Amino acid sequence: MTDQAAERAPISGTTAGEISESVRNLVGTGRLRPGDAVPPIRELATELGVHRNTVAAAYRMLVAAGVAETRGRRGTVVASLPRLDGEAAANTELVDLSSGNPDPSLLPDIAAALAKLDYHPQMYGSLAVEPRLAAWARTTFTPEVDAPFEVSVTHGAVDAVERLLVAHLTRGDLVALEDPCFYASSGTVRLNGFRATPVPVDAEGLDPRALRSTLDAGARAVVITPRVHSPTGVSLTAERAREIRSVLAHYPHVLVIEDDHFSAISRHPYHRATPDTARRWALVRSVAKFLGPDLRVAVVASDPDTSERLGTRLRPGATWVSRLLQQLVVELLESDAAAGQFARARLAYAERVDTLRAELAAEGVETPFPTDGFNVWVPTPHGSAAPVAALREAGWSVRDGGPFLTPASTASPGIRITAAKLTQPQARELAQRLGAVLRSTSG
């Protein structure tokens, strides 16, 4: 349908609920399609003989339900199904610096670990959390979490964040996200009908003043990356974590989720951002970056109520995480080789990232964030599409930063470069190429 579709599709009703239901029926039958505009509030109110506040309330109900979205001057339109971005597959024809994958040579030997497992088949009704993994989690989390907690296991960090938000929020609730933001988090927020509000990130992490403003505006949850923020690579300093705790202490009802996805191989210590006053909180640690992306496991420490809510969604006999997978993960984590393996990965990624940043600096390309992990964020104030296309033509695949920016983002556009396998000669060649591209586009 065209933008005039709603004029031909009869919307009826005299109450906000009836009007909202009428529009939903039109969408359900295909008479209104994604992108179609509904009539302006005043126009529909006149047509139906109701007060414009009634129509405005109906439209708010549609937005909260995820059926419609506001488009500024375009008014209210039927919403499309949100697109949830993911990491790209490695491009074999180009030098792959876009996929976000770790270096396979720095991952442990999974086949050897499998051979050591004393696995016994688990039946319906078995424990949802592998006892050995739960014990490892308690030993690991207890020195860093000064609060009573329970242990849950989810299908990775993205799964954990989604389950936590869905367990505590309702459609239309406001969620504070870092800006720029890990695309999976913003996609999860959109997909579940929540509203994202961006909070800027600087060289020390999440801006506490902006966070306070967002919480004052009604945010009911905040997702924080304490180490190796994606895409910038920033880790919270001790002082910034203290400032964030101080702010959050005044909002004990807010759900605080810390996504510590790079934990075992980060070059920085963990600084807790969750205050003691938080009633609803979770610390999530996945294993994809240091054990391998195919091991879809995250260990979650959370307050008991949140753990119980997660448990209802990860029930034994229904949606639990495979105990075989859990046993494999804890076998790898507790192996004699683990500490050395993680230390080698930590050092290698640090050297590769630092080398790339130094080569970029030599070409006048700024990387303003102190970077941990294996990705480097390069701001491109004049847009990211042209640099991405130019590098691709020259044989380099980098990640366009667009998906990391929410609709209300104030962050600079940028590109993300995965340096996990980058050699020094490659870093120099890439820096020279990117420097030339950015100089040409800035003129």
For each feature predicted by the language model, list its residue ranges.
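Residue-level detector of anion-binding/catalytic polar loops
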Residues: L174, R195, L255, E366, ...
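PLP-dependent aminotransferase class I/II
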Residues: L283-L360, T367-P368
